[in-house]
A protein has these predicted regions:
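Conserved SAM/AdoMet-binding glycine-rich loop
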Residues: 23-27, 32-34, 140-218
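Proteins enriched for Cys/Gly/acidic motifs involved in redox and nucleic-acid/cofactor modification
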Residues: 1-149, 154-156, 210
Length: 218
C-alpha cells in the first residue's frame, strides 16, 4: 500500500503540470473501504476508481469521465461482490504462442495472509462450453500452450448448474486439436483429487507439475 500512495503523490505532482492527465486505480486494494476513504481525502487527483469485479467497465467509465460534463469529478465504481461472469471480452497476449484462460473467479478458502476471498468474492466457475470456445479461438490464432487460471482450479465446476470436475474439464481441453501443452494454477491441496492425478498421468499434453499456494499450509 505504501508504494501505491507514494506513486499517487508523484502522479499528483505530474498532474499539476499536465491537467489533462487521467489517473485510474483498480484492483484488490480498491475493494478496501478504508483505502477509498484515504484516496478521497488525500488524493483528489485520482479520476477513476474501480475494483476487481467490473474491469470490463473501464471503457465505459473512461468515456464517462472524458465526455460527460457532469462527471468531471472522481468516479468511484466498486462492486462489493458479484455472481456474474462477463464473456467474450477482448484481450491481448504478450506472446503469440501461449496465453492464459480464466476458468473461474473468486475463492472459498480463507488462508492466512490472503485477501482474495474478501476482495474477489466467492468462487464462480465459467461454463465449460465458453472456456473451450475461447481456447479454440486462441489455437486458431497460433497458440499452442495455455495456462488455465483460477484462485483454486481444483474446485472448478462446483458452482455450475450442471457441475463438472476440474479433471473432466481437462479431458475436454485435451481434445482441442492443435493445442500442445496445458498448464494450470493455482491448486489447493485439499481439493486435489485422485481423478485429477489420473488425468495428469495419462495425458501427453498436461505439464507434469503442480503449482501449490504457499499460504494453503496455514
Amino acid at each position: 500500500n505504501v508504494e501505491v500512495y507514494a506513486m499517487l503523490a508523484q502522479l499528483k505532482r505530474d498532474k499539476s503540470k499536465n491537467p489533462d492527465m487521467l489517473t485510474i486505480l483498480c484492483g484488490c486494494m480498491m475493494q478496501e473501504p478504508e483505502v477509498i476513504e484515504r484516496i478521497k481525502k488525500s488524493y483528489r487527483n485520482v479520476d477513476i476508481i474501480f475494483g476487481t469485479h467490473n474491469i470490463f467497465k473501464l471503457a465505459e467509465l473512461l468515456a464517462m469521465r472524458l465526455f460527460d460534463q457532469d462527471a468531471k469529478r472522481m468516479i468511484i465504481d466498486i462492486w462489493k461482490d458479484t455472481t456474474e461472469i462477463v464473456e467474450e471480452l477482448p484481450n491481448s497476449r504478450k506472446y503469440s504462442f501461449k496465453g492464459g484462460v480464466n476458468i473461474m473467479f473468486g475463492c472459498n478458502n480463507f488462508c492466512s495472509y490472503c485477501i482474495v476471498p474478501y476482495v474477489r468474492g466467492r468462487e464462480r466457475s465459467r461454463e465449460p462450453e465458453d472456456i473451450i470456445e475461447e481456447m479454440k479461438g486462441m489455437v486458431a490464432d497460433g497458440v499452442v500452450e495455455v495456462m488455465l487460471l483460477g484462485q483454486n482450479v481444483n474446485s472448478y465446476g462446483k458452482t455450475l448448474e450442471h457441475p463438472i470436475s476440474f479433471a473432466q474439464l481437462l479431458r475436454q481441453v485435451e481434445q482441442i486439436e492443435g493445442l500442445e501443452r496445458i498448464r494450470f494454477m493455482t491448486s489447493h491441496p485439499k481439493d486435489l483429487s485422485d481423478e485429477l492425478i489420473e488425468v495428469m498421468s495419462q495425458s501427453d499434453k498436461i505439464c507434469k507439475h503442480l503449482h501449490l499456494p504457499l499460504q494453503s499450509g496455514s
